[in-house]
């Protein structure tokens, strides 16, 4: 989903309480800006903030419902999809100042449960388990994210002027640390670093034996 485009759902009562709480926690304000043409290259600071609000609000809801339905973050099939969605929300939380010392999703979830609990009572009946999973996953991935950010910065510092980021490092982050490749691409885009995505695909195929 492209959260740089305008989606009217984000102006509904479903997201308003979550956005208000997110604003209180982060000190940032959601203004509903949409990047011109829907492009996410070279976003202004406010555009980055607004995209982060939309990603977090949507992903919190998706992950919470999945856990309530018994599909928890994991390494297999649907579980892996849930984990990647959760991790993407955590990554965008960094834009708003959240970190291992300032967790995000478990703090926001009670607002979602209160807002949607009447229509979806499982959000309240399974609140303890949902919070437990969110807290554990966020703690684990924040540590992974910190390591990944450090490695990206170290590799960046060794690049020649205008040089491409090494595809081997992207694969290492994924293979060794479980760092999603699309998230590494996001970090590189933020730093205006080039990467040969076809080379990464080739290396991943070798790793998988395909």
Feature names for model-found ranges:
Residues 1-210:
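A glycine- and charged-residue-rich anion-binding loop/surface
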């Amino acid at each position: 989903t492209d959260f740089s485009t305008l989606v009217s759902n984000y102006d509904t009562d479903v997201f308003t309480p979550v956005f208000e709480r997110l604003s209180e926690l982060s000190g940032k304000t959601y203004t509903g800006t949409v990047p011109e043409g829907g492009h996410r290259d070279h976003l202004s600071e406010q555009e980055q903030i607004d995209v982060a609000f939309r990603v977090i609000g949507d992903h919190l809801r998706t992950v919470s419902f999945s856990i309530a339905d018994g599909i928890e973050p994991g390494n297999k099939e649907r579980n892996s999809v849930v984990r990647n969605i959760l991790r993407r929300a955590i990554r965008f939380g960094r834009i708003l100042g959240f970190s291992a010392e300032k967790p995000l999703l478990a703090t926001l979830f009670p607002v979602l449960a209160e807002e949607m609990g009447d229509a979806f009572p499982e959000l309240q009946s399974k609140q303890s388990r949902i919070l437990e999973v969110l807290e554990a996953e966020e703690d684990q991935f924040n540590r992974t994210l910190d390591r990944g950010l450090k490695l990206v910065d170290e590799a960046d510092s060794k690049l020649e002027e205008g040089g491409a980021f090494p595809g081997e490092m992207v694969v290492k982050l994924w293979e060794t640390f479980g760092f999603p490749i699309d998230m590494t691409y996001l970090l590189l885009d933020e730093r205006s670093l080039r990467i040969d995505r076809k080379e990464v695909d080739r290396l991943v195929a070798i790793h998988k034996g395909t």
